[in-house]
Swiss-Prot record:
InterPro entries: Tobamovirus_resist_UPF0261 (IPR051353), UPF0261 (IPR008322), UPF0261_C (IPR056778), UPF0261_N (IPR044122). It comes from Serratia proteamaculans (strain 568). The lineage of its organism: Bacteria, Pseudomonadati, Pseudomonadota, Gammaproteobacteria, Enterobacterales. Pfam families: UPF0261, UPF0261_C. It comes from the Bacteria. Belongs to the UPF0261 family. This is UPF0261 protein Spro_4740.
Amino acid sequence: MFNTSTFVYIATTADTKGQELEYVRQIIANLGLPTVTVDLSTSSLPANPAADICAEEVAGYHPEGARAVFCPNRSHAITAMALAFERFLLTRHDIAALLGLGGSGGTAIITPAMQKLPIGLPKLMVSSMAAGDVSVYVGNSDIAMLYSVTDIAGLNRISRRVLSNAACQIAGAVRFATAHDIEEKPAVGLTMFGVTTPCIKMVVSALEPQWDCLVFHATGSGGRALEKLIDSRLLSAALDLTTTEVADYLFGGVLPCNEERFSAIARTGIPCILSCGALDMINFGPPETVPARYAERLIHQHNPQVTLVRTTPQENASIGRWIGEKMNACSGEVRFVIPGGGVSALDAPGQPFWDPQALAAFMQALESTLRPTNKRRLIKTAYHINDPRFAHIVTEQFQHIANPRLLSK
């Protein structure tokens, strides 16, 4: 059921896209939904009458005032308006959905603010930039990107169809939103890769009766999404068992985390179990994309689009030290559980990445770096990460540090 006290916000640079703004506004209004239109123009032209909220009002939310937005440097103006729009949106408590229309500049202004909106609130960006790599625009959010096909520069037979579809999509997301019951179980985030899937499935199966289990694909963006939800207090605990993104970050893979990995756990103090899932590999695309410096290394083609380079003992030691320092910043309950029998499906006897020396180097570096406390501990096992006995130990340790009855309150 639609909340009549909320509005579909429509944002664009109305100095160049006022016609398109009015077109989608009218469609949404005809579908029975109230709208608020927002002008994000960075030119110094007079206020556009097509918008309910003028660019000057939005620009006033910049920490340095509107003058920071309306400046001669277009790049600076776009960056400043993006910050102003982000701060403007955070003051609005009547947003049912956000529809953005933009080219490169408009998309750069609108999407950072979209990323700050709650996950689950409909957000759709119609953009001429949506046919390429949109990761910088989407970030860790659930923004939907719709390619405009033609530039958003007037109404024509193509743009009318695309914009009409966008208006109907955002209206449908609002009008036909599914009612969600309040989830009484606390939420826990888990990280998984294909080569650690058996472990995660066993842990999820054991925890599901008491926990709402959210599994994140450890592809760089997955880890960042996990961290965002931890910082947003939408997760009560974490089982970050697949930390492969660290290898890509340190050694140039294509699925890296960033320097902030594990920092949300330290900031919030939520209970967490860590492990070294899939730290035996650095991820690349097709074989021809593997850097020349890795040409003589042990390489495994996982599928036509994914090529894996085996990490060396020296690299694993570097990873161990890096994670150890991150753990030292944690003041909450945190455990690192070592799967001494191998860290992935490929790191097992008879498999291509089996290398006990590499795992030993990781363990030694982690242990020598970590400063244990009564809350921060290292736990060694002899089992492979996908062994049911390892999953049992992980689950048991988690249950020691995370009480779902307390965390659900």
